[in-house]
Amino acid sequence: MTGGVMSQKFVVGAGLLVCSVCSLSAMAGSKPVDLILRVLVDAPPPCSIKGSQVEFGNMIADNVDGTNYRQDAKYTLNCTNSLANDLRMQLKGNTSTINGETVLSTNITGLGIRIENSADNSLFAVGENSWTPFNINNQPQLKAVPVKASGAQLAAGEFNASLTMVVDYQ
């Protein structure tokens, strides 16, 4: 939540609460009312994230099948002064749909990068509305694997894809 949005909600909520208290005291006579407000200021966790490049090496286009060329997508997440251990992760990037899955887009038509959870090779959601909860002591391990659209004839050449990792409190 951004600071501006929270401030607006607090001011509106406090205004409604004050008006309600004023109208009740006017109807019931003059009585003092104690009011206790608790406000939680939500700030992003103080984490640092260091990513790395995933090198797939030389690939044979006909062997790109969503299994071959799987590589660890290593990163370092450090949240030493975090207020809580329960966090959530979001991966953002340009995506496309290949064979029914949302994958990272590359600069080669018909080629994408599938991001997987290393624990079971399941698809790791990529997108603005996809958050994955985790505990700082058990961070998700990711893998990247090239995928080819059914029937695609991949052009030879280097390819690129990138993603951004966002970490926040649950």
UniProtKB/Swiss-Prot annotation:
Induction: Expression is negatively regulated by H-NS and subjected to cAMP receptor protein (CRP)-mediated catabolite repression.
Mutant lacking the gene: phenotype: Deletion of the operon under classical laboratory conditions does not result in any major effect on E.coli capacity to form biofilms compared with the wild-type strain.
Coiled coil segments of this chain: none
Keyword line: Signal
Gene Ontology CC annotations of this record: pilus
Domain of life of the source: Bacteria
An example Gene Ontology biological process: cell adhesion
Signal sequence residues: 1-28
Matches recorded under SUPFAM superfamilies: Bacterial adhesins
Pfam families: Fimbrial (PF00419)
Role according to the record: Part of the yfcOPQRSUV fimbrial operon. Could contribute to adhesion to various surfaces in specific environmental niches. Increases adhesion to eukaryotic T24 bladder epithelial cells in the absence of fim genes.
Note: The operon is cryptic under classical laboratory conditions, but is functional when constitutively expressed.
Family under the similarity heading: Belongs to the fimbrial protein family.
The name this protein goes by in its record: Uncharacterized fimbrial-like protein YfcR
